[in-house]
Amino acid sequence: MSRSPLKVTSPFEYNPGNSSEVVTYLQGLKGGDLPGTFLLVGANNSPGPAPVGLVYQGPLDAISSDGVSGSGVWSTVAVPASFGAAGTSVYGPDNLGEGQANLVGAYTRNLNGDSPTPEDPAIVGFVYAGAVDGSSEDGWRSVQGITQLGTSGTYTFVHSVDGGLAVGNSDNADVDDLTGYFSLSSTAFIVDLETGAQSLIRYPGQRDPLVTHTAYGIWDNEDGTYTIAGGSGERLKRGNSRVDTGEGYLIDYDSVTGRFSNYTTFAYRNRERTDLISHFEGIYRTKGGAYRLPATSVALNRKGDVGIASVVTVKRNKRGDFKPEANWRDLKVTRSSDGEMSVLSTANSQFGQVTVGFAN
């Protein structure tokens, strides 16, 4: 059965005046209050030392004027000045309706050239509850993750939020220069937005210090359980600081018992190619109970830059665990700058049939 062609809207940006120094990154997506509308979040110039957080409410249409896309409403978002932030990046939303939302992300700090420490971190996560445009000053809360060693992280990112829980990662290491993910053993956690309490995500088997997990997406199954998506990576040799293998994963979390179950990993196109590192960037659950995962796969070798954006569909077996064979659909995206096919694309978030990401 043939698939319908992709409808691509690119660029979709907030760049008043079309400045050549501004790049808009679309990082999180949920449904809006009205049919055909969305709640979209991201940042200008993220990653970077001083990103500007963004929230968009409206349809993802092709209307554009003077560098501003869409017929909806854009808002710039920043954590309160009291946080001492250099910049804000919004990674995930949860639309609560009637103009209210939960937002999660991270903010950068200016260390004036000093190395980060647990007492003086470089990047700190945040959670927010309030008006969708970020204007509720008392709705912001910093999140500094606790690593497996029990120390406060120097880098904390809160990636996704749904149903009152958020997931993220914390570490005392920088990110890998090839994949953009943590190169050392990263600590994935859950944070309760109401209480601020953190819980480590417990993966099965003995914890190998050479294996790292990230948590980039969480979905409330509305039965007391949540499903978490992310990536697992392994450094093949001690002393090698970069991730050398990687697969996307899903794991279930029971918020009542605190139990984790059904951990399953997924290689790019079911191991059709073994030279790519794959990572799930978010999660969406259909009405039929299947999960759509926006995924990014990057080259394992350094022969050339390649980034493949995909949407992966995973279903459950009758006994409730995940079927190991997933359906992968690669997204063929053209660059808005010249109309050529992108060789470096990411799929960052998913809602319904809509994927947002980046192409270069």
Set out the residue ranges of the language-model regions:
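Residue-level hotspots at or immediately adjacent to binding/recognition sites across diverse folds
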Residues: 2-360
